[in-house]
Every structure is written in C-alpha cells, then in structure tokens.
C-alpha cells in the first residue's frame, strides 16, 4: 500500500484490519470496565442529591447501567469471547471529579445538584462518544447483531444526557440561582 507521502506503508490491509479489530476490542473492554465502575458510582451520586427528581434520574440510570453491563456481556459472547474489563482511566477521572465536586459543595444544597448534573453529563458524553465509535467500528466489520446491541445502549445514553439537561434547565439551575440570590 502507498502512503500519501510516497513511502510504502509498513502495514498491509490485513494488518490494518487487525489493528482496527484490536482497537474495537480494547474499547469494548474499556467501556465494560466503565459501566461496571458506574454501578458503584451512581448510587453515591444518587445519595448525594438534594432533589428527588435528580435522585430518581440517577437511580433509573443505575438500572440502565446494569442492563448495559449485561448487554456488553452479550456482545462479548457474540464475539466468542468471555467478558473482560480493561481499566478505564477516563471513567476513573470523571468519577473522581464527581466525588471532588461533592466534597466541594455543601450537603443538601441545589448547588450540589448542579455540580452532580455537570459530573453526570461529563460521564454521559464520554459514554456517548465511546458507544458511537463502537457502533461505527462494528458496522464496518459487519457485526450486525453487535451493532444493534450497541445502538440500543447509545440511544439510552443519549436519553440519559437529555434527561439531565432537562432537569438542569427546567428546575435545578433556576432553583439554585434563586437560593443563592
């Protein structure tokens, strides 16, 4: 294969396909770790909420996250593999940031809920980006059943993000401003 700079590429088409499959596998293990990690982090976020509406959103997303873990285990099975988690530094950092925000805000305040929404949305955006990439890679590899499962999770992650946006825009942010003002 030729590179655009005129040099021969060190990788053949088969090697490049293998590299993409390896990237897909690594990302799958990464998001599996992330989802399992979130099953422990979401209850802490829920417990820290001031408003019932936000607590309910985190509780509902915990239920979905448990389904995401099971769905990923099905994906691994479809690929003929045992589910394997690969430490996800991104989710570790995002959940640590959520813990830090919780410590930096006063308990039972709407300001804490604003911080928790921001932290939750950062997690959702990471998941949306990861699942979006996984869907595209699986599609390119013609893994149709895998695509369907990953698209289902992607749709749920986007809905969770929109729910947090709605809670922020329609109640928590305004209430926090009024409480501070």
Residue ranges and their predicted role:
Residues 1-181:
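Amphipathic alpha-helical hairpins
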């Amino acid at each position: 294969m030729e590179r655009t700079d005129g040099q021969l590429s060190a990788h053949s088409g088969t090697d490049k396909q293998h590299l993409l499959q390896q990237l897909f596998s690594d990302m799958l293990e990464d998001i599996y770790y992330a989802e399992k990690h979130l099953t422990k982090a979401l209850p802490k976020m829920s417990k820290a909420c001031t408003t019932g509406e936000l607590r309910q959103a985190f509780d509902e997303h915990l239920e979905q996250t448990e389904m995401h873990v099971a769905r990923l285990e099905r994906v691994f099975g479809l690929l003929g593999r045992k589910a394997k988690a690969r430490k996800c530094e991104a989710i570790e950092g995002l959940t640590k940031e959520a813990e830090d925000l919780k410590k930096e805000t006063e308990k039972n305040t709407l300001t804490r809920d604003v911080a928790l929404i921001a932290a939750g949305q950062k997690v959702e955006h990471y998941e949306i980006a990861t699942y979006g990439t996984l869907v595209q890679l699986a599609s390119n590899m013609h893994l149709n059943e895998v695509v369907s499962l990953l698209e289902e999770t992607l749709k749920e992650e986007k809905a969770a993000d929109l729910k947090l946006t709605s809670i922020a825009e329609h109640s928590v942010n305004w209430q926090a401003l009024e409480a501070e003002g």
